[in-house]
Amino acid sequence: MRTKKQIIFPKFQKLLEQMGENIKLARKRRELTSVQVAERAGINRSTLYHIEKGNPRVSLGAYFNVLRVLGLQDDFLKLAADDEFGRKLQDLRLIGK
């Protein structure tokens, strides 16, 4: 069964590209080569290249493993942690009861 290609709007593609650039900068600050990070993360160097370019087709697990190698795994927990919109919706429902 073929997987459906995900559509990413340009605005959000830019966010992925910025995240990839941040990961690349973190790697370079640690003076690690792409080969070193890829080996430690258990991925191909080409996958790391795609991560650093913000490719949306790379698995979330691969992103996590790269963050782990860079010591940034706690940043992964920040994704969707501050759900301000969800809290406002919840508050509105609670007030309405």
What residue spans do the PLM features occupy?
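A detector for short, charged/polar N-terminal pre-domain segments
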Residues: 1-18
